[in-house]
C-alpha cells in the first residue's frame, strides 16, 4: 500500500531518521534468583518423589483490571490481603517443613530488617507444633547458600530487640548454619542437609 503526504509526495520509510536504542548494561540475567533456583530444586524433588515442597502463593486483592483485548487482562492495581508468612512449605519424610528464602549482596552480614515480625511469629508457631522451620540465605557475591534453623533466627531477632546488633554476621551463619551444596540437579540440595540436621 502506498502512503502519500497531503502534498502528493510518496512517504518513504527509509528516509526517516532511525532511532537507535540506547544500550543499557544490565546483569540481571547473569544468574538465577534464589526463588528461581529453589523452584527448580523443588520441581526436581517432586519429580523424583523425594519431597513435596511448593512456593506459597501471595494472597492479593485485585482492585483494577484493564482488558486491552478480550483474551488479555492486565492487573493495574492490587493490594496484599494479609501479610504473607514464609515462602515455601511442604512435606518431607512425613514431617511438615516451612522455610523462608532470602538473598543479600552484603559480604560480611545478613540484615535482620529483611525479616518481618509476622514471619518470625510464624516460624515460632511451626516449631511449637513440631514442624521444621528454617531459612535459606544466599550470599550473592559469593554464590553461597546456607540453611539456618529457625531457633537461631529467633535468637538473633531477640538479640536485636534487646539492643544487640541488627544483623547476623556471616561468621555466625557459618557457625550455626549449614553450607548447602550446589549442582545441576538439584540446584540447591537442601534435603541432604535436612537429613543430617533433622533426621539423623
Curated annotation (Swiss-Prot):
Name by which UniProt lists this protein:
Holliday junction resolvase RecU
Q: Where is the composition biased (Polar residues)?
A: 10-25
Cofactor binding mode, per the note? Binds 1 Mg(2+) ion per subunit.
Q: Where is this region: Disordered?
A: 1-25
Q: Which organism is it from?
A: Bacillus cereus (strain G9842)
- Entry binding sites for Mg(2+): 85, 87, 100, 119
Q: Which gene encodes it?
A: recU
| Record Gene3D superfamilies | 3.40.1350.10
Q: Which HAMAP family match?
A: RecU
Q: What is its EC number?
A: 3.1.21.10
Keywords, ordered alphabetically: Cytoplasm, DNA damage, DNA recombination, DNA repair, Endonuclease, Hydrolase, Magnesium, Metal-binding, Nuclease
Q: Which InterPro entries match?
A: Resolv_RecU, Restrct_endonuc-II-like, tRNA_endonuc-like_dom_sf
Its needed co-factors are: Mg(2+)
GO cellular component term, pick one? cytoplasm
Matches recorded under SUPFAM superfamilies: Restriction endonuclease-like (SSF52980)
